[in-house]
Amino acid sequence: QRQANAVLGGTSIGRPYTSGTFSINGDDTIVATIGSDKKPADLARVQPDESPLFLTDLNNDLLGSKTLASTQRVTWPSSHDGKLIEGWVMRPPEFDPASTYPLILEIHGGPHTAYGPNFSTEAQLYAAAGYVVLYANPRGSTSYGEAFANSIDLAYPGYDYDDLMAGVDALLEEGYINKEQLFVTGGSGGGVLTAWIVGKTDRFKAAAVAKPVINWASFVLTADLNYYFATTWFDTAPWEDIQSYWDRSPLSLVGNVSTPTLLLTGELDYRTPISETEQYYQALKHRGVDT
């Protein structure tokens, strides 16, 4: 069958990452993984000026009887410099614009990756539970050109915080978000930004920080790609300029945190070692923050 409003991707079914693969034969016919915000990828044949012709239908037996949420593309200017930021809003399936809803800000990892209008098990579950979900591509994300991706060079985390907070503010202006019920979460690079956010503002009722970097100095000496991080994300080694590492570490802001914070990391995570999470957990406990 043919399907409009489909996008390349859909191979990352947990969160709405832009992922996918394709193959081209000699007559310029493309076979690709094509999905949508309501369905993970199927194989489809793609030809110019035609909707994709799907060759598989892998999940209809499961999802065909479900009421799923749709996404809406939104944009807003960053509060830092007016740079246009793209995001998507997912509302509960039975959304009523006259009601108010809690909001979850969900932040992608990387940071050099991107979200899109793709299927997301997590976002669908949040929406089914009655939450509005906002996810976005702040500066540093891929898909918007090299300059946009590299705008966080030696400055991460930083103004990406302003990009995301401006998105929350823009959604609040729509009138259907309960400003007392704001939540934030993210994993890896999203965990970095979630921990950074609760150190900068107390506007969120609770946070879930997954597999974060909390202390850049300890991270570059324990992570699996330690040499890469120390030589490309910073100008010098931590013992040569410890202040540059500290200034960008969420741990430097832990004295400001009052938001109840859940921490999640795998014990065998070599990219964002469990020792990062343990530092943050102990620091929050020392301060009496619910964690």
Task: Please name every model-derived segment.
Residues 30-33:
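Residue position within the beta-strands of beta-propeller blades
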Residues 36-39:
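Short glycine/acidic-enriched loop and turn motifs that connect beta-strands
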